[in-house]
């Protein structure tokens, strides 16, 4: 071999190695539970995620997205924590509501604000503020909402019709709610035992939200129970509880058609309303849902609790820009967020999707 080729060989080999490395696809990993967080049937998470991957890969040649299948929601937190301990966590991951504080406090998630500031395609004003706040900590955004589920007031329409009571409007108040519950809670067969009830499962948490207040300060350092809005919320919850005369109600009581009102997640309404799931839940009465009743304080309203599944990026990802693009594809595009409604049991956190015809 000539002296020239001996000198050039290392550079040629290096060039070949670089070309081979460049031709290999970048592989991103996404983590998600395969079943419903809200424990309802009919969710198609694989259909949803596979569609997102197909869209993302079509727009990003030489990038592949992989995932571990079969992780049930009850095992998801343990699985994800274990992957972090092994240094093998996914680049992009679904974050359960109860896990967000843990991951943000341990600096496990990458801050998203730098990506959003440089990305003209993302407009945070397009999200519902409450859903967006679920992924924020100390003024910084660490996750974006994937889907959210509000709490609604379910109504036994059959029972109201039997009692000649019209369905309340969506702007109803505590006073109307209490009056109806008081009217509906009674002994229907004359045996001296109350067997029909106005409401089941309405407690202090629902009352606090309706009155526009919370139990603790935003920093979690102070209990606010001694403030007037909190006091009136607790008092109202106590009055509602006392209406049932100490009777221990259950899901079965509602399913039997003996309760007029019950707060439930919108995901349950969506999943159980269609046939055949509907007959598994309640076959002897018609039901519907409306907004929760408004509290009496100045900050009160027809507000409800909101449960939000989020998407975040690992702090240790080696592909932060591509991970952001994948997260954005799922959480911020109209195409994928429309599929939240068709394939999952929640609603989109984007105004333009949820409020579209």
What are these regions (language model features)?
Residues 1-102:
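Conserved N-terminal structural module of periplasmic/extracytoplasmic solute-binding proteins
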Residues 32, 242, 279-353:
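Extracytoplasmic/periplasmic substrate-recognition and gating elements
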Residues 69-79, 172-178, 246-256:
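Short helix-initiation/N-cap motifs at beta->coil->alpha
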Residues 91-94, 260-265, 270-272:
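Paired acidic/hydrophobic, glycine-rich loop segments that form the ligand-binding mouth/hinge
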Residues 97-152, 286-291:
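Hinge/lid segment of periplasmic solute-binding proteins
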Residues 113-127, 170, 189, 197, ...:
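Short, solvent-exposed loop/beta-turn-alpha elements that line the ligand-binding surface or hinge
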Residues 137-146, 151, 175-223, 261:
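Extracytoplasmic/periplasmic solute-binding protein
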Residues 180-181, 219-249, 292:
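Glycine-centered hinge/linker elements that transmit conformational signals in sensory
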């Amino acid at each position: 071999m000539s002296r020239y080729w001996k000198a050039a060989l290392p550079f040629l080999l290096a060039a070949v190695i670089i070309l081979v490395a460049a031709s290999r696809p970048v592989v991103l990993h996404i983590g998600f539970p395969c079943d419903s967080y809200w424990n309802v049937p009919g969710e198609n998470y694989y259909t949803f995620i596979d569609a997102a991957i197909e869209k993302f890969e079509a727009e990003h040649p030489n990038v592949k997205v992989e995932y571990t299948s079969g992780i049930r929601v009850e095992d998801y937190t343990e699985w994800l924590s274990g992957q972090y301990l092994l240094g093998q966590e996914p680049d992009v991951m679904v974050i359960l509501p109860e896990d967000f504080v843990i991951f943000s406090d341990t600096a496990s998630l990458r801050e998203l604000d730098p990506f959003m500031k440089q990305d003209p395609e993302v407009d945070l004003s397009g999200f519902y503020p409450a859903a967006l706040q679920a992924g924020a900590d100390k003024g910084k955004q660490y996750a974006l909402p994937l889907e959210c589920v509000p709490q609604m007031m379910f109504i036994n329409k059959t029972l109201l019709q039997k009692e000649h009571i019209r369905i309340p409007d969506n702007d109803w108040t505590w006073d109307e709610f209490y009056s109806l519950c008081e009217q509906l809670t009674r002994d229907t067969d004359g045996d001296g035992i109350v067997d029909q009830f106005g409401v089941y499962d309405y407690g202090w948490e629902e009352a606090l939200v309706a009155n526009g207040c919370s139990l603790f300060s935003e920093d979690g350092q102070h209990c606010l129970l001694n403030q007037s809005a909190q006091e009136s919320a607790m008092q109202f919850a106590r009055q509602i509880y006392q209406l049932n005369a100490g009777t221990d109600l259950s899901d079965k009581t509602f399913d039997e058609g003996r309760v007029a009102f019950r707060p439930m997640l919108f995901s349950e309404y969506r999943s159980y309303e269609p046939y055949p799931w509907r007959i598994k839940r309640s076959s002897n009465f018609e039901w519907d849902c409306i907004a929760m009743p408004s509290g009496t304080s100045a900050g009160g309203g027809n507000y409800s609790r909101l449960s939000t599944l989020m998407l975040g990026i690992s702090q240790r990802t080696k592909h932060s820009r591509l991970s952001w693009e994948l997260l954005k594809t799922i959480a911020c595009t109209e195409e994928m967020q429309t599929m939240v409604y068709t394939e999952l049991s929640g609603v989109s956190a984007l105004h333009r999707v949820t409020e579209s015809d």
